[in-house]
Amino acid sequence: CEESQRVCTAFRQIGHEAYSCDVQECSGGHPEWHIQGDVLPYIDGSCIVTTMDGVEHRIDGTWDLLIAHPPCTYLSNAGARHLWKGHVLNQERYEKGLEGKAFFMRFLSADCPRICVENPVPSRIYELPKYTQTIQPYEYGHPYSKRTCLWLKNLPPLQPTDIVDPVGTWCPSGSYSHKHDAKHKGIFTKD
């Protein structure tokens, strides 16, 4: 999940040859840096990638750094409440979670010297490896809380750069808290 190209663009701005990859088209304005499709054929490097502008790029050897944002729909602790319906395991959702775990683990085991995998707090049922650290938006100048986990390989932990007081939880429009009527406003967010 890197269709926004925020990470890719940040690395390009400081001189790195970075690419984004997602099954969706990019929204960051740089199709010449975006590989649209499944990341798995390219994850270990030693490949030829074609960016959205139709240009082929040869990757010799492994990537220098892999930053991954795999889908969290079935893995996150927030989604765990959907696993049990009337005290019965939702088998379909559980199996989708196992597929999500296999995808997640492919990033952690990629042939790459430096790896960062980002995801929300995982549900314990899937037994993901222990994350290296957690970060919060308010540690980087954004006045919201949303605990995010990082699994790091050969990378130092991130250090806060601009700690501010959080004004509420980060919760985009259309998320759980916005599906309730006005009496629930403010319980999950400050909006």
Where are these regions (language model features)?
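Conserved active-site and SAM-binding loop architecture
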Residues: 1-191
